Amino acid sequence: MNGLGRIVIYHTSDIHARLGFGDRLASLVEPGALLVDSGDALAGSSVFYVRDERVATDLARARYSALAVGNREFHYLHRLFLARARKLPAPLVCSNVIDVWRREPVFARELVVRAENTDVRIVALLVPQYRTGSGWEKIFGWRFLAPDVALAEMFDGAQLMPTIVLSHLGLDADRDVAQRWPQLAAILGGHTHETLPQPEMVNNIPIAHPGAYAAHVGRLELIVENGGTRLAAYELMPLL
């Protein structure tokens, strides 16, 4: 990838069904920018299904491009997981969960989206609920891959565009991922409810955590040049 481009991404995480942020968030996101979430936007959980996820209205108003699967989006029962996904206004993404029974897809393993004039690949990582090969796979049909295993599959070939990770692993795990995967453009994280005023730079990769409960949204700006990316600016902006 040659030339100069710009990628602007707005990022939330761990909203946990807080309401009332959608209109303000929509007013902040400029044309051409992406809006993504790193998981746990909903009220339900992996074992508890909420029929009326009221936060979906705010997610729709804000116009998200992608929603990572967090603990609150995932459900062990496929039919409830699928019903939950169908009520959401943006696609779910999860790269390290495999449906070994090959049922109707609930989420994408990756997405390619356009930010201004640049294609961006979005992958997402969920903290594994049990080990690969566990007996639970035969009960529920879900296989959890270690983050490194999933990323190795994602990078099995030429890297043609910047790759952004939506991580629901927690900050410490995000640091480990950045150390081992220098080809990543950025890690936009959540799960541990930490608020970073500025991204941590690990292995020249920005790791951004905007905190929980829709209190803030992070605005990350990357410059694309010479086949890679660099951090140009970051701002943590109040929402609620």
Predicted regions and their residues:
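Acidic, metal/ion-coordinating pockets
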Residues: 1-240
